[in-house]
Structures are given as C-alpha cells and as structure tokens.
Amino acid sequence: DRRQRQMCIRDRNGFITEDGKSPGFDTVMNIYNTFYYSAAHPVASGNLVAFRQVKRVYPFEAAYRRTIISRLQELFAGKTEELRKACEVLGGTLLPQGDVGYVLPVFPFLNIAVLFWDKDEEFEAQANMLFDSEITEFMHEENVVCVAADAVYYLTLAAGMTPEKIYAQ
C-alpha cells in the first residue's frame, strides 16, 4: 500500500484536510510556514545532510536529539520490520545505510531520510535523519524540527503503532 499522502487546501478558508480530516497541528503549520517563510525561488539541492549541517538550525539541535531522535530510537528498537513497512507505505525509497534506511517525501519537492540501526546485545538502537541541505530555503529553521516530529508521527501511524505526537496534541 505505497501511496503519496495527498492534502487539500481550501481556497475559500485556507483549511487543510487529508481524507476530509485535519492532518494535525504540526503538519498544518509546516505547510502554512512553507508558504510564509520560503525564499522567493527555493530549489531543493537533493543533497541530504545531518541536522547540524542544515543552515541556521544549530540552536535547535539539542532539543531535536533529545526529543525526536531519542524517541525514534525507543519506538522502533526491536521493530525494524515495522519501520521498514512504514517507510514503504509512506512512499520511501530504500537506502543502503543502516538496518533500515529510506528517503521519504515530505513534499513533492522535498525529501528527508530516516536511518536506523537496531539494538543488539552490545549497543542501543541508533537513529538519524537527514535533510535536504536547502530545507531552510523552504521553511523557517524551527520548522525543520517539526518536520522531523511529523516524520515520527507518520512512521508510527503507518507501522500500525499508536501515533506518536511529540509536540502538538
């Protein structure tokens, strides 16, 4: 069941829906902020980099690691098949890195990558996300963290787990 998520923005009132329902605060704000904060003519680089290499996100790195990455590691430790299935359901493209590694579409013009190494008898689970190096040309740097939080939400939902809402309730 690979599908690209499709959202609708009502021209009369600006409401955003997915299958007739609001997709949630973080998703809606990411979309609105992309309209508001994007550069005049943003272009994705296609070059996926670690969070700390994204322009102007440094002040948010500690919170990103503490909330997003640690939660992703906890949620999918011992559940690589569930994570793999979720990435495929979300339209991901397989990567050779990690026990599970996929490029996921955020918008039709912008991707992130999710990389995951499962726990074993010696090491805890490890995870990372990579972002287009020009993502802050599309949105405010604080929204990069929200994109990552949304990724965790949609991955847990697609995996058949309780959807993980890291920021917005």
Locate predicted features.
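Low-complexity, glycine/alanine/valine/leucine- and proline-rich hydrophobic stretches
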Residues: 120, 128-134
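Long amphipathic alpha-helical segments with strong coiled-coil/leucine-zipper propensity
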Residues: 12-74
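Ampiphathic alpha-helical segments that act as solvent-exposed interaction surfaces
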Residues: 20-45, 132-167
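A short, glycine/Asx- and small/polar-enriched loop/turn
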Residues: 1, 106-110
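Short beta-strand micro-motifs enriched in acidic
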Residues: 115-121
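Negatively charged, low-complexity tracts enriched in Asp/Glu with abundant Ser/Thr
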Residues: 55-100
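Single conserved hydrophobic/aromatic residue that forms the stacking wall/gate
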Residues: 1-11
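Short beta-strand segments that buttress and anchor functional surface loops
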Residues: 101-105
